[in-house]
Amino acid sequence: MSPSRNLTAALAVLTALALTSGCTRPTRDPTELKAITEASRLLMKLHPADADIPRARWPRAIARLEPELVSVTSSGVHITTKAYFDGGWGYFVPRRERALPEPVDRFEKVGQGVYWWHPY
């Protein structure tokens, strides 16, 4: 193989590794999910209206997720772990447990009242 082909192959492998390592996945640990739910319920009590929560005020269970943004809305708590042009990836805890987040095809229930959302 020529040196330029070796370089091209190496760059392709490095690009693939970078892209796959950037993909985030939700936790499935029930204890951690329960802590996220409890922390989110506290934030909803403290912020009945829409609010972006400053990093210094994130509860420990949420801060451990290393999110980019935490916001409280009329529908619940959004914990954005990776921003993207159409919303990104993250966790969502609804204000009403039986209220399914919309659009349905972007959300996956991961447990303990926590949903995971992702781009289309």
Give residue spans per PLM region.
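Short, solvent-exposed recognition patches
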Residues: 56-112, 117-120
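N-terminal export/targeting and maturation segments
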Residues: 22-72
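Sec-dependent bacterial lipoprotein signal peptides
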Residues: 1-21
